[in-house]
Amino acid sequence: MAYRICLIEGDGIGHEVIPAARRVLEATGLPLEFVEAEAGWETFERRGTSVPEETVEKILSCHATLFGAATSPTRKVPGFFGAIRYLRRRLDLYANVRPAKSRPVPGSRPGVDLVIVRENTEGLYVEQERRYLDVAIADAVISKKASERIGRAALRIAEGRPRKTLHIAHKANVLPLTQGLFLDTVKEVAKDFPLVNVQDIIVDNCAMQLVMRPERFDVIVTTNLLGDILSDLAAGLVGGLGLAPSGNIGDTTAVFEPVHGSAPDIAGKGIANPTAAILSAAMMLDYLGEKEAAKRVEKAVDLVLERGPRTPDLGGDATTEAFTEAVVEALKSL
């Protein structure tokens, strides 16, 4: 049986990095069937919606989805909504999984191999804001249900890793009702995972420790806003957003995406770095149970990052296509 993979290029360099990731996926030799769909700003301009209903239907008909990048306007546009935020809510993709691992590139700290698991559906990102004259108020929603399931997802990830360690990053010392509910709930769920070493850490200390001693961390679970910040910090430790993959995972489907934006300044020039998209594809293979193929893809990427060619953002002069073909050749040699 072939795996059905939904491909959404999105905007900007998404049109370059998703075809690159597809090329690498095809080189794995796995039985794959690709289904193309559209979403993003370009789709909104053309069709009046950033996520057409048929795109949602295609995602639901596939085993997993690989998304490229989406542009967001810098002004308020009536009727527009961010494609990824919409899909997270519509498909209940409650776990945002962001690995940060040392790579053989300039600026990457050695010894980093961690995963940040971020609750993806609530917190301050419920976008319930209001303003009264000169005062603006935003609601933060933390529920026991969402805290239980993100805690369980993070604990499963930690249980499957060699160090089996989970840090719960929180701000319960200042926000005891909301952050305290999250912390207490994850601790309660952790009783079902006796093999996992569970510790809690105040988020500001966590940020400092990530900078000073990132090698101490294995898996970190936290709330939406805090995870959004910590995961970009972690990406900065290992080479930046251009190398950062991610997965938005629910109980029935998942959407994987490179963390970088649509990069309109280089879109169409053929020099975009496809590493994050290819590593997101590797995460997708792991999600599908093809763990050996996922490891081979990651190994092939590291081989090319180490010996070249590299794209301009990493100090080289390779095109997107040249880098991709080098990864394909490395993959074939493994």
UniProtKB/Swiss-Prot annotation:
Sites annotated Important for substrate specificity and discrimination against 3-isopropylmalate: R85
One Pfam entry name: Iso_dh
Cofactor(s) recorded in Swiss-Prot or TrEMBL: Mg(2+)
Positions with a binding annotation for Mg(2+): D204, D228, D232
EC number: 1.1.1.286
Binding site for (2R,3S)-homoisocitrate: S72, R85, R88, R98, R118, Y125, K171, N173
InterPro entries listed in its UniProt record: IsoPropMal-DH-like_dom
MF terms in GO: homoisocitrate dehydrogenase activity; isocitrate dehydrogenase (NAD+) activity; metal ion binding
Disruption of the gene: reported phenotype: Does not grow on minimal medium. Requires alpha-aminoadipate or lysine for growth.
Sorted UniProt keywords: Amino-acid biosynthesis, Lysine biosynthesis, Magnesium, Metal-binding, NAD, Oxidoreductase
GO biological process: isocitrate metabolic process; lysine biosynthetic process via aminoadipic acid; tricarboxylic acid cycle
Coiled-coil ranges from the UniProt annotation: none
Additional record remark: In vitro directed evolution leads to mutagenesis of key residues and increased activity with 3-isopropylmalate.
Protein name per the record: Isocitrate/homoisocitrate dehydrogenase
Record organism: Thermus thermophilus (strain ATCC BAA-163 / DSM 7039 / HB27)
Annotated gene: hicd
